[in-house]
């Protein structure tokens, strides 16, 4: 009733005409009904409930008004909001950000009847749960809608989306993580701009590559620490509208939002220090009998590539052959650690790039 909604619009219209607004509360309805209640689409909610349930919703009228409710609800509280408007001081309550919100004026609801099943199950919701906000039902219900909305926005902006995720601890959708198939320079920044331009509730947006599982806290943290530079990869927007209950905002509902580009720079993807250290998959046809043959034909090669080329199971024979080439002064390595044939002092491995500098020295 305090946020912009159809219900608020209908009620303020009743007040302007001096009319009461009959309302029935269904307690303990089908769990998927709450999903429909949290959606904002230009259609009747009951129609959406039927669509999500996959069958028509049985409805019955209230006993003191004509408002229909799901017949399979556990309890129905009937009544009306009086015509006097927002007149009663209400609160404070724990709000969706996990902190207490200020007291505000609300309408008065008058109960006219309560009906329930004989074996009624009273359903309740966790709301305003402080540091345990991630357990609140509303967070998870809202995230489904926000994730779908964000995905549609990005697809309409020609951005190839791998996954979209609203973390449950982000106070009802103020944080959004997105993984994309990066295809051109600046795509992460374009995604951030498109999302902030269409979703006012977002406060921080994080964009990663498709190799990161954004639902895995460890992978997401790793991408943040290894691919992000604050002076290069953070975009901030001042004076943006946001969530009015955000306690960090001091001057009304306007504040600063930020986007974080946690993607690998396209122009550096082939660099060794941009290559994730993962266990190699040793599969493929055996192409050579000796290390010398492999390096004469296909150099430079990593050790794992030599194992694949020779069909080695553990690399022991490759180590022996590399040592023989080293003793003859024929073994070289490039700055990325790949092996090749060349001229070097006997008993030593030569460095193919004499300008290479050890970053650890």
Where are these regions (language model features)?
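Internal mixed beta-strand/loop scaffold within catalytic domains of large alpha/beta enzymes
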Residues: 1-26
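Minor-groove-contacting beta-hairpin "wing" of winged helix-turn-helix DNA-binding domains
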Residues: 337-343
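Charged, compositionally biased interaction regions
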Residues: 29-297, 302-311, 315, 319-323, ...
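A short, conserved structural fragment
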Residues: 326-337
């Amino acid at each position: 009733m305090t946020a912009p909604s159809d219900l608020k619009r209908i009620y303020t219209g009743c007040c302007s005409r001096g009319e009461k607004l009959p309302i029935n509360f269904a307690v303990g309805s089908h769990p998927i009904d709450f999903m429909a209640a949290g959606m904002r689409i230009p259609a009747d909610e009951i129609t959406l409930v039927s669509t999500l349930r996959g069958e028509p919703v049985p409805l019955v009228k209230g006993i003191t008004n004509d408002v229909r409710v799901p017949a399979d609800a556990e309890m129905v509280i009937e009544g009306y909001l009086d015509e006097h408007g927002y007149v009663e001081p209400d609160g404070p309550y724990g709000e969706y950000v996990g902190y207490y919100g200020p007291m505000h004026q609300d309408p008065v609801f008058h109960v006219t009847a309560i009906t329930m099943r004989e074996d009624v199950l009273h359903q309740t919701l966790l709301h305003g749960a402080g540091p345990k906000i991630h357990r609140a039902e509303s967070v998870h219900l809202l995230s489904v809608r926000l994730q779908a909305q964000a995905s549609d926005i990005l697809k309409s902006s020609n951005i190839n989306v791998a996954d979209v995720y609203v973390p449950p601890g982000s106070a009802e959708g103020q944080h959004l993580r997105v993984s994309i198939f990066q295809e051109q320079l600046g795509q992460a920044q374009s995604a951030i701009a498109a999302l902030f331009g269409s979703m006012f509730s977002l406060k921080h947006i994080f964009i990663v590559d498709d190799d990161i599982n954004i639902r895995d806290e460890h992978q997401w943290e790793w991408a943040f620490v290894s691919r992000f530079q604050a002076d290069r990869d953070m975009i901030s927007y001042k004076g943006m509208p946001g969530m009015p209950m955000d306690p960090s905002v001091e001057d009304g509902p306007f504040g600063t939002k930020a986007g974080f580009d946690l993607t690998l720079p396209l122009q550096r993807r082939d660099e060794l220090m941009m290559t994730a250290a993962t266990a190699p998959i040793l599969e493929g046809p055996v192409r050579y009998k000796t290390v010398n043959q492999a390096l004469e034909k296909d150099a430079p090669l990593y050790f794992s590539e030599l194992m694949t080329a020779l069909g080695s199971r553990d690399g022991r024979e490759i180590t022996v052959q590399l040592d023989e080439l080293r003793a003859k002064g024929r073994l070289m390595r490039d700055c990325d650690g790949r092996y090749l044939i060349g001229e070097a002092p006997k008993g030593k491995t030569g460095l193919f790039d004499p300008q290479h500098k050890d970053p650890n020295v």
